[in-house]
Regions:
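Long, hydrophobic/aromatic N-terminal blocks
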Residues: 1-40
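Acidic/histidine-enriched, glycine/proline-rich intrinsically disordered or flexible terminal extensions
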Residues: 132-163
Length: 163
């Protein structure tokens, strides 16, 4: 394996970093259960990756649907609490410091089995996941009911394939 092509062509570095301060308000709330911080979006990283802090603040509510992505990997790093991680074969309790990498096509899901929990979620390459998260938030907030076909269309539009 070799290094990828150069992305910066200047002879000297530049001041271009972006700092996210802990304690910042979430960028999005999905119902009473999830708060999402957009740390680095696919757009802000030039499509290299998307990184989000996902805080599950509400009580657990059922088992989430397992799914996979065709265009990107997804990784989870547990920050606090217990995150239930499904690796396509079994559920495991992820504790702070635990990490799960899921390549494209890998079946996965997550939940908070025992109360509040936080994790970092990384998509690579970066994709416009914010649009998907925001549509989910709108559906939850409005109480809008989707047909099975509408759910399928939403999922497929955002590279999410339920199993």
């Amino acid at each position: 394996m070799s290094y990828p092509r150069e992305l910066f062509e200047g002879a000297k570095g530049e001041v271009s970093g972006t700092l996210w301060k802990s304690g910042s308000a979430p960028d999005l709330k999905i119902g009473e259960r999830s708060e999402v911080h957009y740390l680095a979006t696919g757009a802000s990283t030039g499509g290299q990756y998307g990184l989000y802090r996902w805080d599950m603040v509400g009580d657990p509510s059922g088992v989430p649907g397992a799914h996979f992505h065709k265009t990107m990997s997804e990784s989870f790093f547990v920050l606090s609490g217990t995150v239930g991680l499904y690796d396509g074969d079994r559920w495991v309790d992820g504790d702070p410091g635990d990490f799960l990498f899921v390549p494209p096509g890998g079946i996965h899901a997550f939940t908070n089995p025992r109360g509040p929990a936080s994790m970092l979620v990384l998509f690579s390459p970066g994709a416009p996941r914010e649009a998907y998260f925001e549509e989910l938030a709108e559906i939850v907030a409005s109480g809008r009911q989707l047909t099975e076909q509408e759910w399928d269309d939403l999922y497929h539009h955002h590279d999410q394939y339920m199993v």
